[in-house]
């Protein structure tokens, strides 16, 4: 560079490209490998068909609203992959395709882009399927792992949980969604979130803490001998059952929907955990995790307006008064 020639300006405020959805798709691939080990080739077929259909639906939706189609952000892959893994391995091919169509055309497309949609597309798709065909969405019966999932057995009373049952819940040899049963894999993905997205891990941590407190309270209310070994096992099994760990990894951390500030992240995560616990008590569905996500998405703007906005205004008034007193 010659003397007198100015250095090119560097835009320090250039927006960093988000790696959230590509990273989450990597996590889905890990779950796909685990579910293939347990359920066979049918899981890969369902996963592939679901992902391809989500990409095609997203492309059509972008054409309809004349929006630029971006497959590289991996959001469509995330929608298709997660919906398929939340369904049973025996689900018919059309079921995840229908869920993807609802998620893309009725949740994502009307709002123009993933950054403007007020609801989780995946949660909306699975919730829609749960309402329309609960017999297929929660049909977890299999010759290898039995007919009753952990969530169903816990809802029917206080079961006797043996050490073998606890081990099965950790390694994933229990009835459930194709990619939702292996607690070891989910815990590994939580550490992955911690490494790649430490701010999002705050969401996961406080959501799980809320669910853990809820599991303790429910177990204490249902059992006479709370400090018995069976009670401790029930608490651990509750944490591994249903969509609990899936929500901690994929839903409560979803960047476009999560608040940015730490305090609001904590409040948002605790809110989702509380709603999830309440719905687990009153809902007729085997797992109401997706409805908990949607309700939290719906009520979060209300919390922003009536809880955080007044606090912010009060702080601004206080700072102005302090500045005036100094002058």
Can you describe what each PLM-predicted range is?
Residues 40-52, 90-99, 169, 173-183, ...:
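Structural signature of hydrophobic alpha-helical transmembrane segments
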Residues 2-62, 316, 324-327:
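N-terminal signal-anchor module of multipass membrane proteins
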Residues 115-188:
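Long hydrophobic alpha-helical segments that form multi-pass transmembrane helix bundles
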Residues 69-79, 96-99, 116-126, 201-210, ...:
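Cytoplasmic-side transmembrane-helix entry/capping segments in multi-pass membrane proteins
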Residues 118-122, 235-244, 265, 283-296:
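Loop-to-transmembrane alpha-helix initiation sites
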Residues 27-34, 54-58, 76-85, 100-107, ...:
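Hydrophobic, membrane-inserted alpha-helices
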Residues 79-144:
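A generic, well-ordered mixed alpha/beta core segment in the N-terminal half of proteins
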Residues 8-11, 56-68, 104-115, 186-197, ...:
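C-terminal ends of transmembrane helices
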